[in-house]
């Protein structure tokens, strides 16, 4: 999502709608049939995750919540999201409903902050959160420990949550140790410490640790400094450095080293699975920055990347949204050197993959939060390969049961725009605006 402010999950971090790819905080590009009544932020969140004792701020202050956490010696888990946001609903459907997350939530104070509730935007400014979703861990005294990545799979998320809760050192101090010029100035970092750096939610950092313009260079330094014994972690850091170098158009990336790291991931099924989020949500960015256009190296890398993605599309250990993300990445890679010629027919095998994947998502997903996350992206996937009528049909069938149907209307508006139907695009966009809920959402529309 370039137009939406999604945090990878901001792609996730948030598959690719010209709407979505990396962080939900602005409304999508355009959009859908008679409006239905969407759930309000309050009612939707009240229905969700009954096993979690969510604490909701009363106004624009968390002082009382942090004071009680300190008195009870409990860390604080802060969730910042929105009812309509696909990546937020992905976390609800794959993480917050897990029995182990619900059980673990008894050990911390879970704070639920919806961006459309009174005072939320002021709190967002205070805690430096913008992209939806953002999840932050704080020590009982209110010190920020780390920001967790929303784009990783649920098992990885739970592992990182456990590591974050067991840590006594803020990630800011860990970063300073990792970058220290004098290796003897600080204790050697553990494997878990390096892993927390590699999986830190850099996309939602909001310059808390590193100024945005220095982020790609910092990740490159981390990749180079990471001990050889932690090769998997070093490879992920290099993937992150490459992705952010592409996004920020930053100079200084060692493309040869980055290409070698990328190849070590895409050619290894275990590493590829561990970095499924990177392969799905940053495919074009990374390939473009580590290989020259039209080069044999690019052609070989795209072939290897596609082979890895084909395994991820059918990997039952991934969520439906992540499987769909892999299919979207395959489509994205077809336009690696420029948009496809609309006059040329699409590859039949790719069309079959897209149709089958979208249909499987629609048929198999029953959880309403997961549907809010996946169905708009499945519809976008269809429209991205020119199947606009099939995309429209999926979206219109979903409107009566969607958590936030106005989001789906934006995709319908986008489809109409692609057809050259200006009146239809405006009509769906107006319906989406009329049906939207929440002051922040409506302001950003």
Residue ranges and their predicted role:
Residues 24-28:
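Bacterial signal peptide processing site
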Residues 54-59, 80-81, 98-120:
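Thiol-based oxidoreductase modules, predominantly thioredoxin-like and allied folds used
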Residues 56-75:
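A short beta-strand-turn-helix
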Residues 80-96:
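Conserved redox-active cysteine motifs that mediate thiol-disulfide chemistry
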Residues 130-171:
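Non-catalytic, surface beta->alpha helical segment in thiol-disulfide oxidoreductase systems
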Residues 167-172, 206-218, 249-263, 294-311, ...:
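Helix-turn-helix repeat elements of alpha-solenoid scaffolds
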Residues 180-185, 220-228, 263-273, 308-321, ...:
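Solenoid-like repeat scaffolds
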Residues 186-193, 229-240, 270-283, 317-338, ...:
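Generic helix N-cap/helix-start motif at coil->alpha-helix transitions
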């Amino acid at each position: 999502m370039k137009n939406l402010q999604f945090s990878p999950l901001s792609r996730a971090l948030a598959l690719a709608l010209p709407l979505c790819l990396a962080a939900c905080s602005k409304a999508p590009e355009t959009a859908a049939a008679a409006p239905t009544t969407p759930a309000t932020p309050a009612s939707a969140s009240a229905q969700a995750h009954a096993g979690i004792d969510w604490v909701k701020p009363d106004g624009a202050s968390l002082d009382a919540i942090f004071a009680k956490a300190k008195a009870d010696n409990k860390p604080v888990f802060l969730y910042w999201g929105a009812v309509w946001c696909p990546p937020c609903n992905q976390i609800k459907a794959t993480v917050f409903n897990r029995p182990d997350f619900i059980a673990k939530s008894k050990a911390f104070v879970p704070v639920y902050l919806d961006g459309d509730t009174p005072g939320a935007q002021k709190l967002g400014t205070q805690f430096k959160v913008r992209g939806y979703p953002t999840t932050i861990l704080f020590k009982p005294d209110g010190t920020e420990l780390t920001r967790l990545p929303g784009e990783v799979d649920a098992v990885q998320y739970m592992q990182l949550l456990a590591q974050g809760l067991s840590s006594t050192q803020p990630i800011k101090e860990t970063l300073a140790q990792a970058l220290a010029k004098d290796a003897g100035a600080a204790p050697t970092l553990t494997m878990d410490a390096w892993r927390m750096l590699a999986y830190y939610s850099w996309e939602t950092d909001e310059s808390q640790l590193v100024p945005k313009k220095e982020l790609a260079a910092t990740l490159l330094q981390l990749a180079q400094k990471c001990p050889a014994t932690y090769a998997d972690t070093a490879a992920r850091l290099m993937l992150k450095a490459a992705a952010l170098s592409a996004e920020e158009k930053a100079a200084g990336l060692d493309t040869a080293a980055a290409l070698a790291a990328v190849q070590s991931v895409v050619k290894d099924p275990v590493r590829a699975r561990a970095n499924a989020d990177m392969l799905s949500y940053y495919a074009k960015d990374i390939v473009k920055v580590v290989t020259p256009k039209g080069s044999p190296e690019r052609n070989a890398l795209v072939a290897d990347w596609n082979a890895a993605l084909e395994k991820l599309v059918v990997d039952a250990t991934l969520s439906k949204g992540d499987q769909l993300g892999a299919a979207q990445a395959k489509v994205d890679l077809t336009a690696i050197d420029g948009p496809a010629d609309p006059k040329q027919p699409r590859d039949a095998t790719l069309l079959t993959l897209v149709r089958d994947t979208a249909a499987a998502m629609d048929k198999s997903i029953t959880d309403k939060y997961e549907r809010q996350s996946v169905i708009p992206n499945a519809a976008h996937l269809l429209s991205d390969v020119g199947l606009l009528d099939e995309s429209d049909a999926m979206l219109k069938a979903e409107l009566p049961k969607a958590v936030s149907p106005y989001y789906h209307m934006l995709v319908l508006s986008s489809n109409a725009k692609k057809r050259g139907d200006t009146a239809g695009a405006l009509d769906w966009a107006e319906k989406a605006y009329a049906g939207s809920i929440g002051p922040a959402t409506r302001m950003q529309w």
